[in-house]
Amino acid sequence: MTTTITFFGLSCVPVFHRYADNDRIAILLRTPEGKPVATATVNQPDFNLEPNQVLIKDYAENEGILAALANAGIIEDTGKTVPVGHAQARLCRLLVQPTLH
């Protein structure tokens, strides 16, 4: 069964990939037809992550994406943040076993 979440009023499907430079999990949101909506994660290579952790970009155009993913049971917010440029990404635990595309 495919998980569907609502983000900015759009029905979205989370799609999991890996970042090429360090093999970390990336979460992208797509429409059910496959059109891109948002990239939920950011990659901060200088910060050590556990294999089940991701950094969520919940600011600017992605504001609200943390709540959407958490409400769907995909991630859990640890309450910690990591500096990313001039902003802060949220450190989260994956609650699902990602199927990579």
How would you label these PLM feature ranges?
Residues 16, 27, 38-40, 51-53, ...:
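Generic local-structure boundary detector
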